Amino acid sequence: MSGRKSGLERSRSVVVIAGEDRNDRESLKILLEEQQPGLRGGIVQIRDPVRLHKATGANLSKRVRTIVNKAQGVAEKQGEGTRVACLYVHEDLDGVDGNVYLETRQRVEQEIRRQLGCGHYVLAVAEMEAWMLLFPDALSAVVKAWKVPAKYRGKDTGRFQDPKRILMREVSGTKGRRYTESDAPEVFRAVIDGGYHRSPLGSNRSWSHFYQDVELCGRQHLHG
């Protein structure tokens, strides 16, 4: 290896992912590794569920402190002196895009950065399934019969009230394999493998914010 640092120094730092469940964390990991290939082998996860978006004040500070402590703990388990290069905390807003999304994202991310310095709050609107609806061909690649109805294509998926219901009842339908939350990592793997992430069919502000955060993190935290 050359003297110049490239990507993440795995022996000294890791990226930590926290999220609502394993499916969300694995999905985030797939997307992060695509955008920052140097992270492969350098991502670790916190298994505890995240509950931040409704918290404020001292309650928010306490919950973020718990996550930060766990992040530093899992980093230390990778080897003495290992630091957290960056922390990604995912949560679904369970509400559509709007002022509440912006205010919540800002409030929580500011607290994460106040306590750790290098972190991103990945708040999906209304939930991560809304991101999947940006990639109809990826959904069909997972299950050929899965089709996104025309009325949902090319739209702002952050405005859909219940993306999960759309996937379960209208995309996957009632015949054959029906979408479940455990399909999420496979769907995002298909998004990456097919190169669909480069040209989403529609928009979602939380998706755009996530990719902007990954690019920013790559420049500021992961490269020496």
Protein language model regions, located:
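Short hydrophobic beta-strand that contains or immediately precedes a catalytic carboxylate
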Residues: I17-G19
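C-terminal accessory helical subdomains adjacent to catalytic cores in phosphodiester-
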Residues: S2-V14, N23-K54, A58, R65-G224
